Amino acid sequence: MLKKNEIVTVEIVDLTHEGAGVAKVDGLVFFVENALPGEVIRMRVLKVNKKIGYGKVEEYLEKSPHRNEELDLAYLRSGIADLGHLAYPEQLKFKAKQVKDSLYKMAGITDMEVPLTLGMDHPVQYRNKAQVPVRRVNGQVETGFFRKNSHDLMPIEDFYIQDPVIDQVVLALRDLIRRFDLKPYDEKEQSGLIRNLVVRRGYHSGEIMVILVTTRPKIFRVDQLIEQLIKHFPAIKSVMQNINDQNTNAIFGKEWRTLYGQDYITDQMLGNDFQISGPAFYQVNTEMAEKLYQTAIDFADLGEEDVVIDAYSGIGTIGLSVAKHVKEVYGVEVIPEAVENSQKNASINGITNAHYVCDTAENAMKNWLKEGIQPTAILVDPPRKGLTESFIKASVQTGASRIAYISCNVATMARDIKLYQELGYELKKVQPVDLFPQTHHVECVSLLVKRS
C-alpha cells in the first residue's frame, strides 16, 4: 500500500469529467491535477484510502503533445481555468466525449452520434459577468479568486476568461476601496463591509453594471467613490448595492438598492433587446449563448402554427427569440424579478404573443393543461439538477411532438432523457456547445421527438 509523500512513476490514462488526470497504481485509482492522458510523471502521493488516492506532479518525464504550455498555473489552482492546460481543439473533443459517456452511463444509449463541440474562435476573455471576493491578504485589500476547494484568496488582476474591461473595472474598484479605507469582509471574524464585487458588461451594448455586496447598508463616502469610478468608466449605467449580512456562501442577500442610474443594463441577443437586472440569470458567454439558443430553435423546427412552452425561462432570452416565428409562447420562471424582466423585455421588443408566469415549471405545466393550452413544442433550460420527474410527466401529458432540452449538466440531462424514452419519446440528436472554454463545463442541446 502506497503511503503519503511516497513518490512513484505513473502514466496518466484518462481525464475525469472535472479535468483531473487519472493514474492506476497497485489496484488504486489516483487523481492528479495538471496531468494529461499519455503523460508519464513522477507523482507524490498526497492522500490515499482503500480504493482511491490523490497525487501531485513532482516531475514530467513525458509530456502530452496536447498540453497548453502557456497557461499561468494560478488559473488552474484557482479553478478559473481547470481545463486550460489542455489545447483548445482537444477540449472540444473532451466535452463531446463527456456527452457520449453520460448518455451511455445514465441512459444506456450507445448508438447516438455526438458531433464535435461547437467552439469559439477566440476562447478567452469571453465572460460578461464577474463575481469577485474582496479580502485582506498580507495586510492589503485584494480582489481575486479563491484557491480551489478553499476560501483562501489568491490575488488575481487578469482573470483570463473575463471581458478585459470587466477586469479593469474590478481593479479600479479595488483601488478605490483601498483609497477610501473601506474594510473588506473577514469570514472568520464575521466583520468588515465589502464582501464581493459583481460586474456585468453587455457584450453588444458595452453597458456596465456594478454591484457592491456589503454586510450592512451604510457605505462611507459612496457617492464620491461612484463619481471617481464613472469618471474612468462612463459606460457604467447602473451601480447597485446588495446587502448580505448572513454567514453564507451565497453571493447575494435579499435587499437591493440602486446607488446610481437604473437597476438594469441593456444588451442584445438574437436580434432582441434585453433588460438585465442585478440578480437575473443571463448566460455569461453571449457569443456562444446565441449559438446554443439558435441550435435549440433549429432542432425544434418551429413554424408559425407552433405553440411553445419555454420552461425555466429566465429573463425571456430564448422564448422571446422564438416568439416572432410562432403562434404563442408560454414561459415559466420561479424568480419574480426575472418574470418582471421577461414581461418588460417582451414589451420593449413589441412582442405580444409571449406570456410569462411566476411559478415552478411543474405547477405551471399542470395549470396550462387545465386551461386547455396544448403546446406543439417545449423548450427546457433547467438548472444543474435537471428536471423533476413530475415536470417530465406533466410535459409528456401535453402531447407536445418535440422537446428541445438545453442542459448545463449532461449527467442529469442523460438521466432525464432515459425517463422521456420510457414515456414515449425518442432521442433524435444532440449537439454539445462550449459556453465555458478553458473549464470542464459543457452545455448540450438535445432533441426528443414523440414516437408516433
Where are these regions (language model features)?
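Rossmann-like S-adenosyl-L-methionine
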Residues: 2-9, 17, 217, 221-452
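Carbohydrate-binding surface patches
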Residues: 198-202, 208-218
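Terminal RNA-binding accessory module
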Residues: 1-74, 355-356
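Extended interfacial segments that mediate partner engagement and assembly in macromolecular machines
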Residues: 58-69, 73-184, 204
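Internal alpha/beta scaffold segment
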Residues: 153-195, 216-240
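Short, acidic/hydrophobic/Gly-rich beta-strand patch recurrent on exposed beta strands
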Residues: 21-26, 144-147, 211-213, 342
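Short, solvent-exposed loop/turn elements at beta->coil junctions and helix N-caps
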Residues: 115-123, 187, 196, 432-435
